[in-house]
Amino acid sequence: MESGPRTRMVLPWIVVSMLTEGEGEDLRIAAVALVSSEAPKDPRAFVREDAIAHPFMRQAVLKATPPLKDAYPLLGGWVLEHRGFVLFDRFGTQLKALEKEFLRYELPPLSFAQSPTLEVYRSIAPKARARPTVERLIQENLGMILSRGRDSITAMWLKGEVTGALEALRQDAIGLCMLLDLGLKRGTVKLDGAPIPVDWDRRLRSAVRAGNPGLGGSR
């Protein structure tokens, strides 16, 4: 029996940056975790301030040292916040890796089995299939998914253990990606209160070609 044509597996890229603001109980951490299935191709593209909706994310991007000059409009994105810990994931822009400020991870193709949040996903996946929306499930379980965000990641960051903090964030970003992908496929996840259309990937590509790296009318 002949097998069908093989699909070339593309390594996802994850770029992570963190920015702190305030001290003690008022400490906030902005974490930018951007995922793409492709390496950046067009070095002429730049970060557009109007494409970065969340002001704290804008600070994390624009206050990087040295200043960010190159960024690349790519696939998909959303912003979530939980207990002062802000996670930005797949925002449609992949940042150029900068020494000390950014770490780039090249990972094998993602699967649920590779996620450290696999047990979390398994526990809520049956509920997600049984309900018309997964948005509430994501919100209800965000604290469990990002449980390290307020404790371990913050503690590591304050101790100067930047690599450990970024690695923990990367693991959570992968798990959250999977949960949000489930919502995107159902067309139920919302960004800034507006539903992301089922054909969000086509709309985004069209928006990028038109010079707008935002979500193409879905905001």
Feature locations, PLM:
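Glycine-rich loops and low-complexity Gly/Arg-rich segments
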Residues: 39-42, 57-59, 110-115, 193, ...
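Conserved DEDDh/DEDDy metal-dependent 3′-5′ exonuclease domain
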Residues: 54-132
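Generic detector of well-ordered alpha-helical segments enriched in charged/polar residues
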Residues: 69-76, 95, 99, 135, ...
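Internal catalytic-core helix/loop-beta-alpha segment
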Residues: 97-100, 121-159
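Acidic, Mg2+-coordinating catalytic module of metal-dependent nucleases/exonucleases
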Residues: 140-201
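Acidic catalytic cores of enzymes that act on phosphate-bearing nucleotides/polynucleotides
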Residues: 196-219
